[in-house]
Every structure is written in C-alpha cells, then in structure tokens.
C-alpha cells in the first residue's frame, strides 16, 4: 500500500443500528489522499463495496493501493481478525 492509516471507531462514527455509518467509510478512504492531490486530479467515479459491519471500539486499518495514474483502491480492515469491512475504488481525471 502507498498509504496506511489506523484508528479506533468512536461513538460519533456509529449510526442508529450501532454500526459504522456508511458515510464514514467514504470519508476515511477519501482522506488517504493529500489535499495537493486534488489540485491535479478531479474525482470521476467512486464505487463502494460494504463487506462487513464495523462497531464502536473496533481498531481499523486503512490501506490505499495505487493501481494506475487514475485509479486507486482503499481497503478498510478490522485489525483483530483482518476482516475487510469495505473497499472503495476511486477513478480520477487529470486537471487540464
């Protein structure tokens, strides 16, 4: 991976069903890109696969893989069992 981050799920990340709110996964994935990246590339497509539920107190790892100039995949895993909770695919368009 070209970027790795880790943190613990907090109460503010949880929805009414006591699972991680789906929007949080997108935020966590998006935040693996530095602000300067967005000066050179515009987001074109986001595809999200929700694979398992995260809960408060889970320790998570976020890994970004650079697949090509305009394509990246971010995988969010639960640390205790390495279960993939979510995969987010980003397609970018260079700024002209």
Residue ranges and their predicted role:
Residues 36-73:
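A conserved acidic, glycine/proline-rich C-terminal tail/linker
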Residues 6-10, 49, 91:
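Generic structural detector for well-ordered beta-strands
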Residues 15, 20, 26, 54-56, ...:
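A generic structural micro-environment signature
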Residues 24-28, 50, 74:
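Broad hydrophobic/π-residue packing in well-ordered secondary structure
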Residues 17, 21-22, 31, 49, ...:
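Detector for Asparagine
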Residues 1-42:
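Hot-dog-fold acyl-thioester-processing enzymes
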Residues 4-6, 45, 87-89:
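Well-ordered beta-strand positions in beta-sheet-rich domains
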Residues 1, 54-56, 65-96:
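HotDog/MaoC-like acyl-thioester-processing domains
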């Amino acid at each position: 991976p070209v970027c790795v981050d880790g943190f613990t799920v907090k109460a503010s990340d949880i929805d009414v069903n006591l699972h991680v709110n789906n929007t949080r996964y997108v935020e966590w994935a998006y935040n693996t890109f530095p602000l300067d990246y967005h000066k050179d590339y515009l987001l074109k497509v986001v595809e999200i696969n929700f694979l398992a539920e995260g809960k408060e107190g889970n320790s998570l790892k976020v890994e970004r893989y650079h697949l090509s100039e305009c394509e990246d995949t971010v995988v969010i895993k639960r640390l205790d069992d390495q279960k993939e909770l979510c995969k987010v695919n980003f397609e970018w368009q260079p700024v002209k």
